[in-house]
Amino acid sequence: MSELQGAFLASIGVGLVLFVLVFIFEGRAFSKTGISKYSLLRYFPFELNCFKRNSKLSYVYPVVTFMGTLIISAAFLFFALETQNNGGAITVAYIMFAVSCLTGLVFNALTFIKLSNYQLHLIFAVLFVCLNLLEMILSLFFLPNTNYVYVNAPHQATQIAVFIVTFLLLIFEAVLMFNPSYKRWNKMVKVDAETFNRPRFNYLAMLEWGNFIIYILNLLPIGIVMFF
């Protein structure tokens, strides 16, 4: 294992640990408010922290989340550096790194923008989806292509694995995007206040959290290329 491969794995591990810890602690704090248990299927990313106003602890969630996304995006940088060492197409690799950084920043913005500013929140949610789609398209079209030296010609199994994983991620994204319930959003949720009624399954929140999961899983194709 090369140093860059080790750094790639370390960045993913540290980033995931930070995300898990912040979700556990913030989720427990949310439950103590007496509202209900925090659920990824019902509550938005910004709601994990919105109840701690004018508190020093309110800065923990955005700071740790920013650090986590920064470290996760660093994995794409290590992939770009490994590609450069192997004589691959570094331009695409660095573009993927840049897209990952932008995606992380947009998610961090979603942890601040409340539904009281509904249009801005929706703009960032759409941008979050589009950046994830761009990352997957780059993986699908460039990583399995031997002309860009990401995968050596004899490694057909690696090419197939990258294609299948990326295609499955695209299907997951399509399921999140093309949910018929979005058409009934105004009937299901009152959006003119920060405190509102909502269904058991909040599909816009699911779209945001689902794309956060995709943001993490986008590391799988480049991980396959780096190690196989």
Task: Mark where each language-model region is.
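Hydrophobic transmembrane helix segments
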Residues: 25-50, 225-227
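Cytoplasmic juxtamembrane regions at transmembrane-helix boundaries
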Residues: 76-99
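Interfacial helix-start motif at the membrane-water boundary
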Residues: 47-70
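Membrane-proximal helix-loop-helix units in multi-pass membrane proteins
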Residues: 97-162
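Terminal transmembrane helical module of multi-pass membrane proteins
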Residues: 140-228
